[in-house]
């Protein structure tokens, strides 16, 4: 069944041109490189005991590692909990407790911010041509992300997003924008 992870697989097999560009760092990646580096992070997470259905908090600066970590979590059938780097320890602790996060993906600068098992992504640039980790099968109704609200009327709430939600949103955006294979899209939202 087509979902976010298999969508990435399908594109990695047919596109060898750069599909991701970070102007801040001048990083450029094609779909196969993204899939290989995503697989390396997923392999590391699997070695940390992460499995389908586990909830993983991401606490990184805006970066390609953030995006690849998100894809890696989905590749394992786990559930991503994206957070913003401006969150305080108190805000993170609330989300960790509420979401029942099992692990936090972060970096050296933030490794001591809260008491939760951590994974710090290594230099994944070395894995651009690495071995692809097969994706865990997921259905459209499987949860892939807990997106916490701003909490303007109380405590933040974890909105449950499924693989089907994401895939449908991507499909609809491509239809509305009439995007074609050679089009360029600029993502401006912070992670």
Residue ranges, per PLM feature:
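A short N-terminal helical cap/helix-turn-helix that marks the beginning
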Residues: 1-19, 36
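Conserved ATP-dependent adenylate/AMP-binding module captured primarily in the ANL superfamily
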Residues: 85-113, 130, 169-186
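ANL superfamily adenylate-forming
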Residues: 109-141, 155
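Conserved AMP-binding A3 loop
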Residues: 30-32, 144-171
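Conserved AMP-binding/adenylate-forming core of the ANL superfamily
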Residues: 19-49, 54-63, 67, 71, ...
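Hydrophobic alpha-helical segments in the ANL/AMP-binding
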Residues: 9, 46, 64-83, 93, ...
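Conserved pre-ATP/AMP-binding loop-to-beta segment of ANL
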Residues: 15-16, 131-148, 155, 178-184
């Amino acid at each position: 069944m087509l979902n976010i992870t298999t969508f990435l697989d399908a594109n990695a097999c047919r596109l060898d041109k750069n599909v991701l560009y970070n102007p801040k760092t001048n990083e450029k990646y094609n779909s196969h490189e993204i899939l290989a580096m995503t697989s390396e992070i997923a392999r590391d997470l699997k070695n940390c005991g992460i499995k389908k259905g586990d909830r993983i908090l991401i606490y990184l600066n805006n970066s390609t590692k953030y995006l690849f970590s998100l894809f890696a979590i989905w590749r394992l059938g786990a559930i991503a909990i994206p957070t913003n780097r401006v969150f305080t320890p108190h805000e993170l602790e609330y989300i960790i407790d509420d979401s029942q996060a099992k692990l936090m993906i972060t970096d050296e600068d933030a490794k001591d911010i809260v008491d939760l098992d951590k994974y710090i992504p290594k230099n994944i640039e070395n894995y651009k041509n690495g071995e692809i980790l097969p994706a865990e099968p997921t259905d459209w109704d499987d949860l892939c992300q807990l997106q916490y609200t701003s909490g303007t009327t109380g405590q933040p709430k974890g909105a449950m997003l499924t693989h089907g939600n994401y895939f449908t949103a991507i499909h609809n955006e491509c239809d509305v924008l009439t995007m074609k294979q050679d089009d360029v899209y600029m993502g401006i939202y912070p992670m």
